[in-house]
Structures are given as C-alpha cells and as structure tokens.
Amino acid sequence: TVGSFQNSDFNRTYFDELYDEILKTDALIIDIRNNSGGNSSHADYLISHFIHLPIPQGTWSSPMYIAAHASWNYPREWYMQTPDPILPMDEKEIYQKPIVLLVNATTFSSAENFCVLFKGAKRGKIIGTPTGGSTGNPIFIDLGFGLGCCICTKHELDTDGNEFIGIGIQPDIVAEEDINTFLNNGDSVIEKALDFLRSK
C-alpha cells in the first residue's frame, strides 16, 4: 500500500494519530501542495520521524533597525542565526520506506521549510513545480480601505547554503497539474508520484 495525507492545518496530534498506520505502508506520499504553512516546529517534528541522522538547518537573517545608526548612515545591520540541527525521533520507530513529497507554487512558509529539510536529508524525491520561495514570518501592514499586505521578515538559506527566497525549491521531478485529469476527478501529480514509486 502507498499511504498519503494532506492537511493544510497540520498539527502534531493529527500526525500522531496517523503514524501507526503510516508505519504499515510500503511507501508514503506527503502532499504539501497549496499549503501556506503555519508553525515550523510541526515541520521539524514531522521530519524527525523520517531521518536517521541529524539534519543541519539553514542560516536565517533579518534586518535590524537602530535609529542612531540610521542617522549616521551606517550600512544596514542584520541579525543572523543558525538553528540547531533537527534530531531523529528517539521515542518512536523511524519510518524507513520510500517517500515522495508533492509541492507546488503555493507551498509556502513552514511547509516550504519542511521541503528544505526533506531535500537536505535526501530522504526522497520532490515532485511537482517549484515552491513559492518565501519563508513566511510576515509582518502585516494595514493599507486602509479593507486592504493589507504581508512582507516576509526573514531571509533564509537552505541546508546547503543556497538561496531559495524568491526562487523556490526546485523539484527533482517536474509534474504540472493537468486540467483534463482534474476535470475527470484525477490528479496527474499524484499519478506521477505513484508511477515513480512503482518503478522502485
């Protein structure tokens, strides 16, 4: 059997309820298409069930503003941090079967961070189209008249030190959603993932 799950409001309780069933599968499809993110600690928790070795996390930075420095025309200053590596889960059995991760242009924020970790761990193939290219952590600006905008506050690198902000995580296998398949209640991206897993 090939297990799959998609939950745009992922949380640990939801995953824990599924995990015993996931362990019984022969392969797993994780679908984070159209997932705008949420709490990055959930992504860290999820990946910890699929790895045997620690995964380094990418360095992130955010601009700092010190009014006096600005008045003296100092160059922009940045706060930088490299979080601790993600460790394998030590309280449960690690899932060792093949995994495919599905992504698209509306995979953002913590969902995209999960994609970064998954790719860094070399845990499986990423199938779909490039992700959105934004880590999230937005600041909201009220523009008035019922309008607003969000601006990303973090600049982040992947686990290998590569840029993905404004670029997206590139899939290993490109698969675009097909309108004809969709109209017939199918999913061409999942079909591509299944074809790949059957070939293993």
Range-by-range predicted roles:
Residues Q170-K200:
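Low-complexity, Gly/Ser/Thr/Pro-rich intrinsically disordered linker/tail segments
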Residues L53-P54, P63-Y65, C150-I151, I173-A175, ...:
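Short, intrinsically disordered/low-complexity patches at protein termini
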Residues T1-G144, F196-R198:
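Cleft-lining beta-strand/loop regions that shape enzyme active-site pockets
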